[in-house]
Amino acid sequence: MNEKEKAELHEIQTDLANYLYNNYRIYTKNKEKSEEIKKKYNRGNGSITEKEYLQKMKSIREYSDINKIEFTSFSVGPMNSLDVEFIINDVYPDYTILGTISAETGKFRYSFNTGNTINNYVLERKENSSTEKMPEKNIIYTNKGVE
């Protein structure tokens, strides 16, 4: 991998980390409280309504801002896309497929599978995004190149 390719991968990692940092967060639920609420709801046959069940389940979410991203690999996908694997906050491994470049910015468009539970955490889009830069020390770059 030459210096130009290294610089391009570094820029992709920085942009992707900042995008996640500004637009997403993760949450987990207290397992005991979740089980207690499920018992009370009992698939619609319990002592609380569906609306109450949904409200209670949402209220026990424990949110965490994204404060660390570790990039683990880059590979070329079956459709010549760039597949990027990373770990958020040391607990949420995920990946994205970069295959579309924005006509406006000339950079990759990012998309993520929100709502998936991985290691008891869920990635969720923030209600209000920001434009801050993630501290460089919190981005763990991979320099292995594209596999």
Regions found by a protein language model. Name each.
Residues 53, 73, 93-95, 135-145:
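Aromatic-enriched hydrophobic runs in primary sequence
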Residues 60-101:
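Exposed beta-strand-loop-beta-strand "reactive/processing" segments of non-cytosolic proteins
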Residues 25, 30, 47, 101, ...:
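A generic structural signal for solvent-exposed, polar alpha-helical segments
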Residues 93-119:
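A short, surface-exposed beta-strand/turn
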Residues 26-29, 43, 88, 97, ...:
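Intrinsically disordered, low-complexity regions enriched in small/polar residues
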Residues 112-147:
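C-terminal partner/receptor-binding element of secreted or periplasmic proteins
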Residues 1-75:
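N-terminal export/targeting and maturation segments
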